[in-house]
Curated annotation (Swiss-Prot):
Native organism taxonomy: Eukaryota, Fungi, Dikarya, Ascomycota, Taphrinomycotina
Keywords: Membrane, Transmembrane, Transmembrane helix
Protein name, entry field: Uncharacterized membrane protein C6F6.04c
GO annotation (BP), single: transmembrane transport
Lipid bilayer topology: Multi-pass membrane protein
GO MF annotation list: transmembrane transporter activity
Record bears the keyword Iron-sulfur: no
Subcellular location: Membrane
Amino acid sequence: MVALVNNMRKITIPSVGGKLVSSGQFQNFIASCILFCCPGIYLAVTGLGAGGGHPDAYHMADVTNSLLYALFTVCGWAGGPILKYLGPRWALALGATGYPIYIGGLWYFDNTGKQGFTIFTGAYEGIAAGLLWASTAYISLSYSCANQKSQFIATQWTILAFGSTVGSFIAFGINYHSTSTGVPMAVYIIFIIIMACAVLLAILFIKSPSDVRKSDGTSALSPSNKTFGQELWGLFEAAKDWRLLCLLPASFASQSTIAWQSHLNSYYFSLRTRSLNNVLFWVIQFFVPYLFTLILDAKALKRRTRGIIGLTIQAVVIMATLSGELGWIVSKHIDLHDTSPDLDWTQRGYGGALVLYLLMGIQYGSSIVSVQWCISLLSSDPDKYARYAGLYKGTQAAGMCVSFGIDAAGVSFLGQGIIYFIFLFVMCASQLIMTSIFGKETDRLSTKEHFTDDKSYIDGVMPSTDTYMNEKTSDELDKKSLPSDQVYV
């Protein structure tokens, strides 16, 4: 792996140039398109249930996904140092290769019923996904100005959701008249082709951070060119930040409902109905991130005020949704050990089930934005963003790993719902507490803190410090309450 990383750094394939391409917003758009092609399409497959295969294969999917997200966790945590060593361009290109390979593994399983190769491809995707997600999170945080954080995050998630919607429409169109429980070969082929395009996007359009300019004209500082060992030590130091540790439970919980919802969709509905559910689940997420952004980035309100308002609304919706879904499971006596009702959209009872499924889509999309927005309160240092991004995505993957592990263990739908009620309550509470404490603060590290032991930089360019000094915050900070060895504005 070390040799591969070193060789990739030496590759000098030219990328597309131009002022537009080098803007932070365009770079975030390209990162979003990569999410469209890879995780977006992958989540469409996951939403079909059982990893896109036959519903009786859900145990194989749970085992594979547990391994995938376990490796995703480890590689996500290490993603920051690897990202800073490779640079975003090659980190994204390498990370994108895991998704088409994994879909190929699912295709192989659907045709042969043999699990070995599928489990291997799941393991490879876990490694690749940790790198891809750390890179996209870094871009959303480092290439945006102080008042654009949630906008950049929302752009990534909305375009990813569009990818999942396109994938779901493809599957829905093919499955509309299908009576089979499996996924047709055409779905796999189309998905693999779309995912492979992400590798080309990364190679052709992603620029070095030293070449990227934010919308206010300042430089998106290039991560420092420390040794890999120094970067790992920096990761360890970041992991000791108690503020970040307080938000990691929120990261853990934010997407942990994925296996529960996927299995419910696979178990309770017919193939064409769960394909329709999948379409609508992602369509609603076109709107959720940007509606949430209108609150979190509202210039008329102070940052802490708008954060508390937005996160309180989110908490009420999430808790009400989970309460409703638990009530639905109890009232319908839904038990995974019973025969599937195979509910079709033409049958009575579908409307209420669909509403609950869509509300869980609101939880899913809003949680992505809210956790990253809370993490953006902690710092404006690109070095820290790279490390925070890896720790955040790795911990989020750990929650998804546990989610698939719980499902694979045969825990009842009701039992899983209670677990996720607790998880998401902790998420909402920790976000509100951290926003109330740190909502007014933005870490503007001094030149001394960021550059003391850094003598060389990516592309040999000494980053400008004007990014730290020129970003404006919406709030005034009571400097008397802050430690004297740090600079805040």
